[in-house]
Regions:
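Extracytoplasmic cell-surface/polysaccharide-interacting catalytic and binding patches
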Residues: 2-13, 17-234
Length: 234
């Protein structure tokens, strides 16, 4: 009888130990899956921008951050703005032809540091707050117009905000000429109307990005934005 009780105790103890081990393993596994899933979600939301299709077609937006080791050779324009030296010949040719056509563009903004980008965003948020927006709404609205540091094409040196010398022509003159002709020089209007849901940025008729002549012509003819174009290359 004692042997039987002793045997039952051993069986019971082994069963309890098994349950503890099983339950502990299950919880640990579930936690690992949950944490791993969180990591995957974060990774899907925040990729590092890739130059797989060439430096000209690197997509930088709110979901694709500029690599920490990204390098460029900057050159300074006559008005103090800076751009990637690789796009200078095409930008200069475009501006020369525009002026010959009676249109007078200039680069209002070129390359920006992360600190400069942050300051612009902060100023935009402050402006909306002064208009009575809540903190959350001010931030959300500001980010429709100003990219977070690390997600702005201005930090690539490949994008320029173009304005008009209004003493000689109107802004509309410049924007209309650029819409019709910029692709010939490898530039596209990066944030066109009707594409905000894809680009994440409201229509900016002044923001132009160098993508190379071949891609620019195909984007111009198709009506795609850069995200759609690169997606079609995959």
């Amino acid at each position: 009888m004692k042997r039987k009780k002793s045997f039952l105790k051993k069986i019971t103890l082994l069963f309890v130990l098994f349950l503890i081990t099983y339950v502990g393993h299950t919880f640990a596994t579930n936690d690992a899956v949950r944490l791993q899933g969180f990591g995957i979600i974060k990774q899907e939301e925040h990729h590092i921008a890739s130059d797989k299709y060439g430096w000209e077609l690197m997509i930088v937006n709110r979901d694709n951050y500029i690599p920490d080791d990204y390098e460029m050779d900057l050159m300074e324009l006559s008005n103090g703005q800076k751009i990637d030296s690789r796009i200078y010949p095409y930008l200069q040719e475009m501006f020369d032809d525009a002026r010959n056509a009676g249109v007078y563009p200039f680069v209002r903004d070129g390359y920006r540091t992360a600190e400069e980008q942050q300051q612009i965003l902060d100023d935009k948020i402050t402006a909306y707050r002064s208009e009575g927006y809540t903190k959350h709404m001010a931030e959300e609205t500001a980010m429709e117009w100003v990219a977070l540091p690390g997600t702005s094409e201005h930090q690539l040196g490949l994008a320029v905000d173009i304005n008009a010398d209004t003493s000689k022509c109107s802004r509309d003159d410049v924007y209309n000429w650029l819409l019709e002709n910029s692709y010939k020089y490898g530039f596209i209007q990066r944030y066109p109307s009707g594409k905000t849901s894809i680009t994440g940025v409201a229509n900016e008729p002044w923001h132009y990005r160098y993508v190379g002549k071949k891609a620019a012509e195909e984007i111009h003819q198709s009506g795609m934005c850069l995200e759609e174009y690169v997606e079609n290359l995959k």
